[in-house]
């Protein structure tokens, strides 16, 4: 523990402060700003030679600025002789561009970012609820992907919901939703979205009986909130008594807050992997949980060369 040092950029300093409080160590001193032309500038204000350095920096909006802060900081620590550099990226931006669809001339941006982080000398990466698990394979360095589900499950249990059912908002999220349902010992529902004909709106098929149930939609992130709001509407139309949504990453871009406020969703519960905007904080239907204890425990285990997977057994 004596060699561990934790630093942060400007992406989510509040989370970093919460993590170091859990670890009972001070937050490292680094200055991260911009030159007059907008270039990122960074300077480490204390000795890091031989230290086990952790940089807490989600690559949320402004995505490119936060990514460049992480890259430039990592280079500064490498040139300052840190013994090991771990990038703690609670929310990994560019994760949605992880494949090249057939006949599409697009970049695989997740791979580009993985290469950038590796080439600047980062030794390992710690993420929370990667959008696609296969992104770990884009790196040539160790990647530990931990889960936000324990925090979400604990809160669900504390709420003492009656007649509870976990629902996946789409087919792609079934594995995640099934794991939460299994942890809670409750039923699983699935929403199957399909477009019956071209130029026709999507039809939502509900797999499972939601009549009179308290339904909880589970997903890794909420972006514009369109999927969750449409899912909540479909569930209510099929007789659900209450509909809540639990998501790890509150990206909440575009008209997300407006969509949530106009929806029939009773509450959206998120973690603090991404800081909430002022509008999100003012929305009485959004509640934020603290994921710092989970991140701090993972950091401690990495520093002490202990098992990460043992956290989730």
UniProtKB/Swiss-Prot annotation:
Which SMART domains does the entry link to?
Pribosyltran_N
Recorded hits in Pfam families, A to Z, give: Pribosyl_synth, Pribosyltran_N
Pathway where this protein functions: Metabolic intermediate biosynthesis; 5-phospho-alpha-D-ribose 1-diphosphate biosynthesis; 5-phospho-alpha-D-ribose 1-diphosphate from D-ribose 5-phosphate (route I): step 1/1
Binding residues annotated for Mg(2+) 1, in chain numbering: 131
The record lists the catalysed reaction(s) as: D-ribose 5-phosphate + ATP = 5-phospho-alpha-D-ribose 1-diphosphate + AMP + H(+)
Required co-factor(s) are: Mg(2+)
Q: What would be one Gene Ontology cellular-component term for the protein?
A: ribose phosphate diphosphokinase complex
State the compartments where it is located: Cytoplasm
Q: Where does Mg(2+) 2 bind?
A: 170
Q: Which residues bind ATP?
A: 37-39, 96-97
Q: Which UniProt keywords apply?
A: ATP-binding, Cytoplasm, Kinase, Magnesium, Metal-binding, Nucleotide biosynthesis, Nucleotide-binding, Transferase
The EC category is: transferase
Q: Could you give the subunit structure recorded for this chain?
A: Homohexamer.
Name the chain's protein. Answer: Ribose-phosphate pyrophosphokinase
């Amino acid at each position: 523990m004596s060699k561990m040092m934790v630093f942060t950029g400007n992406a989510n300093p509040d989370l970093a402060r919460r993590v170091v409080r859990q670890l009972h160590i001070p937050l490292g001193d680094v200055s991260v700003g911009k030159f007059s032309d907008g270039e990122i500038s960074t300077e480490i204000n204390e000795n890091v030679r031989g230290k086990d350095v952790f940089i807490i920096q989600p690559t949320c909006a402004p995505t490119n600025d936060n990514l460049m802060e992480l890259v430039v900081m990592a280079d500064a620590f490498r040139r300052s002789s840190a013994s090991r550099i771990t990038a703690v990226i609670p929310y990994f931006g560019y994760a949605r561009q992880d494949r090249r669809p057939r006949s599409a001339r697009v970049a695989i941006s997740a791979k580009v970012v993985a290469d950038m982080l590796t080439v600047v000398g980062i030794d390992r990466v710690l993420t929370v609820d990667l959008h696609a698990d296969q992104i770990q394979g884009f790196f040539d360095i160790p990647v530990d992907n931990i889960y936000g589900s324990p925090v979400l499950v604990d809160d669900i249990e504390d709420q003492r919901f009656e007649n509870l059912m976990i629902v996946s908002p789409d087919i792609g999220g079934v594995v995640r939703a099934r794991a939460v349902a299994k942890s809670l010992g409750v039923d699983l529902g699935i929403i199957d979205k399909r477009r019956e004909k071209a130029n026709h709106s999507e039809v939502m098929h509900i797999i499972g009986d939601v009549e009179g149930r308290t339904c909880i939609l589970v997903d890794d992130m909420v972006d514009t909130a369109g999927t969750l709001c449409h899912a909540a509407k479909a569930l209510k139309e099929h007789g659900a008594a209450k509909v809540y949504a639990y998501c790890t990453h509150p990206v909440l871009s575009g008209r997300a807050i407006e969509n949530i406020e106009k929806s029939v969703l009773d509450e959206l519960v998120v973690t603090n992997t991404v800081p909430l905007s002022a509008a999100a904080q003012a929305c009485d239907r959004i509640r934020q949980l603290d994921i710092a204890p989970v991140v701090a425990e993972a950091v401690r285990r990495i520093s002490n060369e202990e098992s990460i997977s043992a956290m989730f057994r």
